[in-house]
């Protein structure tokens, strides 16, 4: 009888110890999962939006200094951010997911399937805004000429011809992503919103290279 009771006691003790061990492992996993991740340390696939949904967001709807709005496009994060001066501070106003060139790196020539990069010291500018609702393009994929630019085409003044910010008719499933021939694509709804609320001829546009670190004002306004 004593031997049976002793065996039962040992079994209960072992089971209790095992349950405590599992609970401890589960608790550690939860703590690890909740740890904040630095976007600069994320694998490129995550940082570029391949594994996360992204939608347009407006962060500030108040008044900002006239003529102070500018754009920063991140090749790494696949986002177009609108900034402006509010009470003396550079403030994040809005954000849109984008589709950029199929290939990474600095654009060197027409047709190389790369989006050009620039710096804050030498930004690109919006040189004209055109109604592109009837424009077609043949991507060479067998579909022939198709509507491909959305409602608006915002032409950029760059060292290369034909680069602009436009809609994404028929390809919005690749947003955000890397599929353009060099232009910056927004969804059709987003290009309309961006044009109506922020874009204007002469607006500065900075397109950051994949390895370009965040500017101080970007770090201060991470959302």
State where each predicted segment sits.
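Bacterial N-terminal signal peptides that target proteins for export
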Residues: 1-9
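Alpha-helical transmembrane segments
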Residues: 12-16
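C-terminal motif of bacterial Sec signal peptides marking the signal peptidase cleavage site
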Residues: 18-21
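Bacterial signal peptide processing site
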Residues: 23-25
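Post-signal peptide N-terminal segment of mature Sec-exported envelope proteins
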Residues: 30-52
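Exported/periplasmic cell-wall-interacting domains
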Residues: 46, 59, 132-223
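Gly/Pro-biased beta-strand-loop elements
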Residues: 49-166
């Amino acid at each position: 009888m004593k031997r049976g009771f002793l065996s039962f006691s040992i079994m209960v003790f072992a089971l209790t110890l095992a349950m405590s061990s599992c609970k401890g492992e589960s608790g550690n996993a939860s703590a690890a999962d909740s740890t904040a991740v630095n976007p600069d340390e994320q694998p490129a696939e995550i940082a570029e939006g391949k594994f996360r949904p992204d939608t347009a967001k407006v962060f500030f709807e108040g008044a900002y200094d006239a003529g102070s709005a500018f754009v920063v496009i991140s090749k790494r994060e696949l986002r177009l951010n609108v900034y402006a001066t509010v009470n003396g501070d550079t403030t994040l106003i809005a954000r849109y997911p984008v589709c950029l060139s199929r290939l990474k790196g600095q654009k060197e020539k027409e047709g190389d399937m790369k989006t050009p990069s620039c710096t804050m010291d030498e930004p690109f500018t919006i040189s004209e805004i055109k109604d592109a609702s009837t424009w077609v393009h043949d991507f060479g994929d067998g579909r022939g000429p198709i509507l491909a630019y959305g409602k608006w085409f915002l032409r950029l003044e760059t060292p290369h011809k034909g680069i602009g910010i436009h809609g994404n008719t028929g390809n919005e499933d690749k947003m955000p992503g890397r599929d353009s021939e060099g232009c910056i694509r927004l969804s059709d709804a987003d290009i309309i919103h961006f044009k109506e609320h922020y874009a204007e001829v002469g607006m500065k546009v900075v397109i950051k290279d994949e390895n370009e670190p965040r500017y101080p004002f970007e770090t201060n306004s991470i959302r």
